[in-house]
Design a protein with these regions (language model features):
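Thiol/disulfide oxidoreductase modules built on the thioredoxin-like
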Residues: 47-53
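Thiol-based oxidoreductase modules, predominantly thioredoxin-like and allied folds used
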Residues: 28-42
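Chalcogenol-based redox active-site neighborhoods
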Residues: 20, 47, 80
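Alpha-helix termination/capping residues and helix-transition junctions
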Residues: 24-27, 51, 64
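Non-catalytic, surface beta->alpha helical segment in thiol-disulfide oxidoreductase systems
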Residues: 59-85
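Methionine-biased hydrophobic packing positions in alpha-helices, especially
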Residues: 6, 45-46
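Residue-level recognition of specific faces of alpha-helices
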Residues: 3, 14, 56, 66-69
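Local sequence-structure signature of Cys/Sec-based thiol-disulfide redox active-site neighborhoods
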Residues: 1-29
Length: 85
């Protein structure tokens, strides 16, 4: 399973939902980058993703986007192959 990286904050309900969703798909480790705790992390996230909101989710080197994007990817049948790559 590829590494999962997620940019998050402490008070983000979509971050919690994304983590729960990924764990329900068998993901046992998510590297969380807390943009509210680490100086410069939000700017780095915005440079990397082009987005300002959290969560921002990477599966391996693939930028999935936020929770809605993750859900849409799953509905389209693209999440499981990405998790198994």
């Amino acid at each position: 399973m590829p590494a999962i990286t997620m940019y998050t904050t402490a008070v983000c309900p979509y971050c919690v939902r994304a983590k729960q969703f990924l764990k329900s798909r068998g993901v046992d480790h998510i590297e969380e980058i807390r943009v509210d705790l680490h100086p410069g992390a939000r700017e780095a996230m915005m440079e990397r993703t082009g987005r300002r909101t959290v969560p921002q989710i990477y599966i391996g080197d693939t930028h999935v986007g936020g929770f809605d994007d993750l859900s849409a990817l799953d509905r389209a049948g693209g999440l499981d192959p990405l998790l198994q790559s």
